[in-house]
């Protein structure tokens, strides 16, 4: 609401506590990124190990989800998610497996400050800040709406979501030009004539 370009990190029960606000953030098309070390939720017992229960519980909130499978992907997708959220105005949940990836010790090619600057367009940051609440350009937000208006508001967000996959791939392509590391929305590995595939996510 104040125009800050923010990001945060959470996991497990902490993510569950954020779900009510995640609906608001997505509904208001506010660009932000949340990084999640995907972990088990406390049920009959407490477990702190890797699982996708937490991110799947937040799947219906309207946030785009971007998964990383290695420490290098985590580092790179953090920047790709930030670029994509600014272009799309859809908030992003960037997640990776708790402990298996979040605590892995490995070699990682670090991005420079210049790399970061080149992937975060100044004009999109300024646009984001211009959408902040201000007495200089007041507008109404957070009203109580009857079903007819509420439905129209939800429908008006569809173009932003429909454009998001293409914008994410464009961010990945721009990132590849910058670093030589190419990512895709989905990568196929296996025989070219396969008639069955297994879809897997994470490390």
Model-based region annotation:
Residues 1-58, 63-86, 170-203:
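Thiamine diphosphate
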Residues 55-59, 106-109:
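Metal-ion/cofactor- or nucleotide/acyl-coenzyme-handling active-site neighborhoods
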Residues 92-188:
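Conformationally flexible catalytic loops at phosphate/diphosphate-handling active centers
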Residues 7-9, 137, 197:
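Short, flexible coil/turn micro-motifs enriched in small/turn-prone residues
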Residues 13-20, 49-53, 60, 69-79, ...:
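Conserved active-site and cofactor/substrate-binding residues in soluble primary-metabolism enzymes
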Residues 5, 31-32, 91-93, 195-197:
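Beta-sheet entry/capping signal
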Residues 9, 35, 95-97, 199-202:
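Generic beta-strand/beta-sheet core signal
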């Amino acid at each position: 609401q104040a125009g800050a370009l923010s990001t945060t990190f959470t996991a497990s029960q902490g993510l569950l506590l954020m779900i009510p606000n995640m609906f608001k953030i997505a509904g208001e098309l506010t660009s932000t990124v949340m990084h999640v070390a995907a972990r088990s939720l406390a049920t009959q017992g407490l477990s702190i190990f890797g699982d996708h229960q937490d991110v799947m519980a937040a799947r219906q909130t309207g946030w785009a989800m971007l998964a990383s499978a290695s420490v290098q992907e985590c580092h790179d997708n953090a920047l790709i998610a930030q670029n994509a959220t600014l272009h799309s105005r859809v908030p992003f949940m960037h997640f990776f497996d708790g402990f298996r990836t979040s605590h892995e010790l490995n070699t990682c090619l670090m991005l420079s400050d210049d790399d970061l600057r080149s992937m975060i367009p100044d004009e999109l940051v300024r646009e984001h800040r211009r959408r902040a609440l201000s007495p200089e350009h007041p507008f109404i937000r957070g009203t109580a709406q009857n079903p007819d208006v509420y439905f129209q508001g939800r429908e008006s967000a569809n173009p932003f979501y429909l454009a998001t996959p293409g914008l994410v791939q464009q961010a990945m392509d721009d990132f590849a030009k910058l670093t030589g590391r190419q990512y895709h929305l989905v990568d196929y590995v296996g025989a070219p004539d396969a008639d069955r595939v297994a879809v897997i996510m994470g490390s």
